[in-house]
Amino acid sequence: MNKSPTACDVKRLTIMLVAGIVLSQLGVSATATSENSAARDLAAAKSFAFGGVGVAGLMSEGERNLRAVVERPDASQQLQAAFAHATLAGELYILIGLRRCDRAAYQKIIGSLARPNDDVEVARGCMISREPFRQLLSQIHDGRFDDYLSRPSW
């Protein structure tokens, strides 16, 4: 026996369809927000650190955020957008990321970058110190941090 849909069935189907569309859009929005949060957090970095830091030798939050951004297909765009409002430590991370994923963008920024005399908080192993921004910038330009992102994360 064929049963034709009632008005109640059509209404329920319509509500489910609309709810599905809304939920799928929220999922896309939440994903985009979490992807952008890594770039935003990277730009806000208070200190600069690569490799194991602290007593436990853990990966720094900045390195973890940089790795998350660099893995994205739009990494260069995210890094360049984040650079505009980055702290000095954030700028260093972003330059390392651009050097890896978009050399042309890296060269463009490095060529026009103001080189302040300010110091940046740096963590190396268990030691926290302040180092000149210019010195760290020179190390980035010399490729001293290039291999860190090639290593597997732990």
Predicted features along the sequence, with ranges:
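HEAT-repeat alpha-solenoid elements in large eukaryotic scaffold proteins
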Residues: A44-L58
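Residue-level detector of extended alpha-helical repeat arrays and alpha-solenoid scaffolds
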Residues: M59-G62, E91
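Short coil turns that connect the paired helices of HEAT/ARM alpha-solenoid repeats
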Residues: F83-A89, L113-M127
